């Protein structure tokens, strides 16, 4: 079975010290060392902390590769970028073989990935575990809770800066894109091919802005749209695809006899559970702990990343909640231990790797006048989307309010010229990167072909055999699918004994990532 392309490794590893390097120095030879059990090689290279000061301090950037398994047919280097922000590329792609050995990517390319700056093995952003664990967990219900978010964000940002140092000011996506070109240069390649999904697509988009001529090919799967400046538009698009995904799940269950809720009013079951959770009257039969409406929505949201691995379990879980019986699947938890049934870290640590807010809040500037405006947005969304109410990605906005750091890479429309033809696969409904974001990105990237997957899910290389074929054909031969090509939805008709549900990536606070 194809493993997930957005496996996330969040835990921070080794923090390295900065050193200076002359701007004009030729790239030092890479000191590759064997890593993992599938033939990977790993190394660390030095890149500027601040590309505006190329002769200044450097940071360690961890990279890894799997050499082409058919070297006589090698095309070149394919850089595969993880999602997040905060996701490791080395752990899934180099150490754990998230891209199958028989794929064209593995056969004909040296597959190269990285832990992006500030993440994992690459001079990670670190924060006090105790402060991270103090995070508010819910959308603010009143002015006091809104002010608590503002105070917490200021406290966390100052704490992360204290434990990380000046690097924290330079983890924005523009620098992440420049890091890709540093990797290209140190590998001695004139051009690279690039594949990414989710947040990694923004890195690819900005790389195409900066270095369009250094791209041989670019396939960006499930796209961010970094031109969105409206808070309401951001929340609306994410909730729209959650509502659409839920309705697709209902239709699937109605037509799939093996679904645990087949023959029942699936929408009614969900709405009833949500009403009970919102009223504080829904308990987890397995633990006796209360389940909040936010936790219930996060469980639904999480299952929409991977229908093949999750929908049967989701239906069974909802049925057992409705019947008051224990279930093997757990309702999503959101952070620290509390009376709301959330769970904390398994063992105490002084600091943890937590790159997401430092990267995200360097990229996104949100204008919010105060609690009343946010509350009005929530009420509008609940009227527009009566079943799912509000996407859990409200946290993408809340975490940046009063963050004590510069927005170095604010939202903007892409300005790209001279890029190669680009393939942009997208789903009909995608809770991680909504359809509207993909269309928005496609309009900003010249020579883009949109590949439509008519199903639900995040990461179409995994979710659709049709999309996977087109992606690999394009990357190897540069042949794009005809414009207007659509891939049919692929949903399971019976539970699989071997399928493993791939959950959406979470931050250390339990909030979802891209």
What are the language-model segments listed below?
Residues 312-314, 373-374:
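Solenoid-repeat scaffolds in large eukaryotic assemblies
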Residues 1-25, 45, 180:
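Secretory targeting and sorting signals
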Residues 274, 297-304, 315-322:
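Short, amphipathic alpha-helical segments that act as regulatory/interfacial helices
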Residues 282-299, 305-309, 343-354:
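Structural motif
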Residues 166, 224-243, 315-319, 326-335, ...:
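Flexible "cap/lid" loop of the alpha/beta hydrolase fold
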Residues 304-308, 429-432:
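Acidic catalytic loop of the alpha/beta-hydrolase fold
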Residues 256, 307-310, 320-331, 464:
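Short, solvent-exposed helix-helix connector turns and helix-capping sites enriched
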Residues 26-295, 358-360, 364-514:
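Gly/Pro-rich cap/lid or specificity-loop segments adjacent to the active site
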């Amino acid at each position: 079975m194809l493993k997930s392309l957005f496996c996330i490794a969040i835990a921070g590893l080794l923090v390295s010290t900065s050193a200076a390097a002359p701007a004009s120095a030729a790239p030092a030879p890479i000191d590759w060392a064997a890593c993992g059990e599938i033939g990977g090689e790993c190394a660390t290279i030095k890149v500027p902390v601040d590309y505006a000061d190329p002769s200044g301090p450097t940071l360690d950037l961890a990279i890894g590769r799997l050499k082409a398994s058919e070297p006589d047919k090698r095309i070149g280097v394919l850089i595969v970028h993880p999602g997040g922000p905060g996701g490791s590329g080395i752990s899934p792609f180099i150490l754990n073989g998230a891209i199958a050995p028989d794929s064209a990517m593995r056969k004909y390319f040296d597959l190269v990935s990285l832990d992006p700056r500030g993440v994992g093995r690459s001079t990670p952003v670190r924060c006090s575990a105790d402060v991270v664990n103090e995070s508010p967990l819910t959308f603010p219900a009143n002015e006091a809770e809104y002010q608590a978010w503002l105070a917490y964000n200021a406290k966390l940002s100052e704490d992360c800066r204290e434990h990380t140092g000046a690097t924290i000011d330079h983890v924005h996506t523009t620098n992440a894109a420049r890091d890709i070109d540093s990797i290209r240069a140190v590998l001695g390649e004139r051009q690279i091919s690039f594949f990414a999904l989710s947040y990694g697509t923004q890195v690819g988009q900005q790389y195409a802005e900066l270095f369009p001529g250094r791209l041989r090919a670019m396939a960006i799967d499930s796209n961010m749209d970094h031109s969105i400046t409206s808070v309401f538009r951001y929340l609306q698009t994410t909730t729209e695809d959650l509502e659409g995904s839920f309705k697709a799940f209902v239709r699937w269950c109605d037509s799939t006899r093996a679904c645990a809720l087949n023959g029942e009013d699936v929408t009614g079951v969900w709405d009833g559970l949500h009403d009970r959770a919102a009223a504080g009257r829904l308990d987890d039969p397995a633990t006796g702990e209360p389940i909040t409406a936010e936790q219930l929505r996060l469980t639904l949201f999480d299952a929409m990343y991977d229908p093949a691995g999750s929908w049967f379990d989701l239906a069974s879980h909802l049925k057992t909640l409705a019947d008051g019986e224990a279930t093997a699947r757990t309702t999503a938890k959101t952070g620290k231990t509390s009376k709301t049934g959330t769970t904390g870290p398994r063992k105490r640590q002084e600091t943890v790797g937590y790159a997401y807010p430092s990267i995200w809040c360097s990229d996104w500037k949100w204008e919010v006048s105060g609690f009343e405006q946010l509350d009005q947005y929530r009420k509008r969304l609940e009227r527009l989307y009566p079943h799912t109410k509000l996407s859990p990605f409200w946290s993408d906005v809340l975490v940046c309010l009063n963050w004590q750091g510069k927005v170095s890479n604010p939202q903007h429309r892409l300005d790209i010229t001279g890029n190669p033809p680009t393939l942009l696969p997208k789903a009909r409904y995608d809770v991680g990167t909504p359809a509207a974001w993909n269309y928005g990105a496609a309009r900003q990237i010249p020579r883009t072909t949109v590949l439509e997957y008519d199903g639900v899910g995040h990461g179409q290389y995994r979710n659709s055999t049709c999309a996977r074929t087109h992606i690999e054909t394009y990357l190897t031969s540069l042949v794009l699918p005809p414009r207007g090509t659509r891939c049919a939805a692929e949903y399971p008709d019976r539970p699989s004994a071997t399928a493993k549900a791939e959950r959406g990536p979470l931050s250390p606070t339990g909030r979802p990532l891209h």
